[in-house]
């Protein structure tokens, strides 16, 4: 039997689900939850980032269109907009923050965040990226850099040890 696992399924499979369950229990995130679990909320929020969803409607419609493919990941049904909004407001964000740091520690320990080079630098190695983000002058009058254009300049310093800004 041939099994095709989606890229999103592989990403969710890399998350330590047992440590997520212990974080949910420790924070009491599902204390008043009736049908929409914290895991389903995490899946919805990761989906929104990867799909570049801009609204709750985009998230819910995108998950509804993929329901047959996401049911094996622990998401029973696509959430309603009001349910997702209520969960985003009332569930503690500390659960997801600790999940990020736990996952980052797991990947650092397993060596998944890059190969160790045969040489080492004496000082910290970082890359600098500079990007211009265009903005509409009618909405952001403070962002003028030309007479007819608006924008801001973003500088990001990326560490090569853990790939975090």
Segments predicted by a language model, with ranges:
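Conserved, well-structured functional cores that handle cations and Mg-NTP chemistry
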Residues: 1-165
């Amino acid at each position: 039997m041939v099994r095709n696992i989606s890229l999103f399924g592989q990403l969710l499979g890399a998350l330590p689900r047992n440590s997520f369950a212990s974080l949910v229990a420790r924070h009491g995130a599902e204390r008043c939850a009736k049908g929409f679990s914290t895991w389903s909320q995490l899946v919805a929020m990761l989906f929104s980032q990867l799909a570049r969803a801009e609204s709750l409607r985009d998230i819910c419609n995108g998950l509804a269109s993929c329901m047959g493919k996401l049911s094996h990941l622990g998401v029973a049904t696509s959430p309603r907009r009001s349910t997702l909004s209520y969960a985003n407001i009332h569930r503690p964000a500390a659960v997801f923050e600790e999940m990020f740091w736990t996952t980052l520690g797991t990947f650092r320990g397993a060596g998944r965040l890059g190969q160790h080079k045969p040489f080492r630098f004496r000082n910290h190695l970082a890359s600098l990226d500079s990007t211009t983000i265009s903005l509409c002058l009618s909405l952001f009058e403070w962002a003028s850099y030309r007479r007819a254009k608006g924008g801001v300049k973003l500088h990001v310093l990326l560490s090569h040890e853990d790939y975090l800004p």
